[in-house]
Amino acid sequence: MRVVVAMSGGVDSSAAAALLKEQGHEVIGITLRVWSYEGKATCGSCCSPDDIDDARAVAQTLGIPFYVANAEEIFQDRVINPFVQSYLGGRTPIPCVACNRDVKFNFLLKRARALGARLATGHYARVEEVDGRFVLRRAVDAAKDQSYFLFTLGQDELRDILFPVGGMTKAEVRAVAERHGLVTSQKPESMEICFVPDGDYAGFVEKVAGPQPAGDIVDTEGNVLGTHQGIHRYTVGQRKGLNLGGGEIRYVHRLEPETQRVVVGPAEGTGRDNFGLLQPHWVDGPPPASQPVEVRIRHRHSGAQGRVHVSPHGLVSVKLDAPARAVTPGQAAVVYDQDRVLGGGWIV
């Protein structure tokens, strides 16, 4: 079988390529160039010139062909621009989902299919075929599971996608890379968004969109408590960085882009047990309203029990059994049935 491996320059995709080569497949390595480096912020893991060099070195060690594909235009259009606009609109985006949906599993999958190949990545997730339908499941290594970022995949994509490391632990993945003598075997992980490696999201937004208008920080009654330098600097549930002096501890309840106000209050005011989902996507159809499900409202969220209701017009609402703290507009809510990903959408 011919397989294109999306090689990020990290240990996971390196091990994925090695495993497929061991299994006798015809493996082709491709790294996506998603960022121009001159005059822009340094790009982090999976994007930088050093990562491209590491991916090339791994391909040479494994004896597989290697190519670099330019995806800068689609990355700018589908990932960078929506990321910035979300922050300016008072939402907290999660660009990795958009990158997976539009870049890795659209742009790159199309190119793999044009070569008569399937596409493999280093994601920690699993795909199984059950009665002719494809099921997306959590990874075996719960601490590394990345299924949350993959809820936009559907039957058409899953039939041609492989996740070779999804059934392994991180230690086992590193052992595979070590056994093959790959330069990435002990490479550290990056926990930040790849195009904002220093974690300064507000600074990145300002580099792209320029200085943003200041506004008031108010309590839930509308009383002015202080000022801020742009709502893009805040997210729902945030406590640090409000600079309101002493007194009671306050948290961000909501952001109002129309008035440029940041509304704050006590911790209990950040909880929500119901919310809607924009642009819902289901891996193989939505769950019935009577079915109990687990809902993860951010990547590191342990999950909350609840139910999902889909109206005849496709509008989706989530009702949790108990309020969850910091349900944040712009983040993804992903719906699970045990280890099976059912789908999800964007919190409003």
Swiss-Prot record:
Family stated for the protein in its record: Belongs to the MnmA/TRMU family.
Site-annotated residues for Interaction with tRNA: 123, 331
Chain positions covered by the region annotation Interaction with tRNA: 144-146
Keywords: ATP-binding, Cytoplasm, Disulfide bond, Nucleotide-binding, RNA-binding, Transferase, tRNA processing, tRNA-binding
Organism: Myxococcus xanthus (strain DK1622)
Top EC class for this record: transferase
Record's protein name: tRNA-specific 2-thiouridylase MnmA
Molecular function as annotated in GO: ATP binding; tRNA binding; tRNA-uridine 2-sulfurtransferase activity
EC number: 2.8.1.13
GO process annotations (BP): tRNA wobble position uridine thiolation
PANTHER family to which the protein is assigned, alphabetical: MITOCHONDRIAL TRNA-SPECIFIC 2-THIOURIDYLASE 1, TRNA 5-METHYLAMINOMETHYL-2-THIOURIDYLATE -METHYLTRANSFERASE
List of catalytic residues: 99, 194
Localization, UniProt: Cytoplasm
Reaction(s) this enzyme catalyzes, per UniProt: S-sulfanyl-L-cysteinyl-[protein] + uridine(34) in tRNA + AH2 + ATP = 2-thiouridine(34) in tRNA + L-cysteinyl-[protein] + A + AMP + diphosphate + H(+)
GO cellular component terms, A-Z: cytoplasm
Binding site for ATP: 6-13, 32, 122
Gene responsible for this protein: mnmA
Disulfide cross-links: 99-194
Superkingdom as given in the UniProt entry: Bacteria
InterPro entries: MnmA-like (IPR004506), MnmA-like_C (IPR046885), MnmA-like_central (IPR046884), MnmA-like_central_sf (IPR023382), Rossmann-like_a/b/a_fold (IPR014729)
Chain's role: Catalyzes the 2-thiolation of uridine at the wobble position (U34) of tRNA, leading to the formation of s(2)U34.
A Pfam match: tRNA_Me_trans_M
